[in-house]
Amino acid sequence: MKGWIKCGLAGALVLMASFWGGSVRAAGISLKQVSGPVYVVEDNYYVKENSMVYFGAKGVTVVGATWTPDTARELHKLIKRVSRQPVLEVINTNYHTDRAGGNAYWKSIGAKVVATRQTRDLMKSDWAEIVAFTRKGLPEYPDLPLVLPNVVHDGDFMLQEGKLRAFYAGPAHTPDGIFVYFPDEQVLYGNCILKEKLGNLSFADVKAYPQTLERLKAMKLPNKTVVGGHDSPLHGPELIDHYEALIKAVPQS
C-alpha cells in the first residue's frame, strides 16, 4: 500500500520521532536508520549478526529475535529510545539460535513471534541440536529452552499493511530461511542467506543455494539496499551476485 497510514496528531508525532535519522547504541548492539522507518540492528554478541526493525504507525516489527533473551532485552531498550510504540511482532527468519534465541523475551513483553510453518517445524524438531551446535563453538552461549512461534504462516506473508513482505525462495543457508523486503524503501534483508563472507555451511544446501539466488534475482525487486545477515550490513544489489559466486566455488560432495 502506497503512502503512510493516516493517523492522528499524537500518532504522527510518535512517527516523526521514530524517523529522526540517527542511531542508538549499547555496549554490544546498535540500531541505525537505513531509510525512513527501516533500521538495521548490528548485534556484536557471540558472532556478529544483523537484524532489522521497522517502526510502523501503530507499532514496531522486529526482524530476527537476536541471540538470547538478554540480547533481545538490550535491543528493546534501544527501540524504546527511538519510539514509544509497542513491539507488535518479531519474525524468526530461520530456526537457528541467532534468529530465534530471543523469543522468550519478546513473548514476555506481549509481542507475537511470527514464522513460517517450515521454520516452526524445524525449530520444534531440531532446537536441541542447534543449541548444542552453537554451544560447541560458543561455550558461553546459554542452554536455551525451546520457545516456539505463536503465529505461523503456511507460506509467504505480509505485515505492517504490506510495507513488510516476507517470502521464501528455496533452500540455502538453512532449509527454511526467508527474505524480508521493504517495498517503499527498496530495502531487502538477506537474512543469513546473504553476507560478505561464505560463513557457516553446516546446515546449508550448497547445491540448491545458487538456484535459490537465481529465483531471487528473477523476481526483479527494486533494491537500493541489500542488508547482509552477518559481517558488515549495508550493501547494494551486487551482494547477491557476490555471494552466489562464493557459494558456486564451494566443492560439492
PLM feature spans:
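Bacterial N-terminal signal peptides that target proteins for export
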Residues: 1-12, 20
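Sec/Tat signal peptide C-region and signal peptidase I cleavage site
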Residues: 20-26
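Metallo-beta-lactamase
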Residues: 28, 32-34, 59-61, 67-69, 120-246, ...
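Conserved beta-strand hairpin/beta-sheet module of binuclear metal-dependent hydrolase folds
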Residues: 32-77, 178-192
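Divalent metal-coordination and catalytic microenvironments
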Residues: 37, 54, 64, 79, ...
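Extracytoplasmic/secreted envelope proteins and their assembly/folding machinery
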Residues: 51, 72-76, 100-103, 210-213, ...
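Active-site metal-binding motif and surrounding structural segment of the metallo-beta-lactamase
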Residues: 57-59, 69-114, 219-222
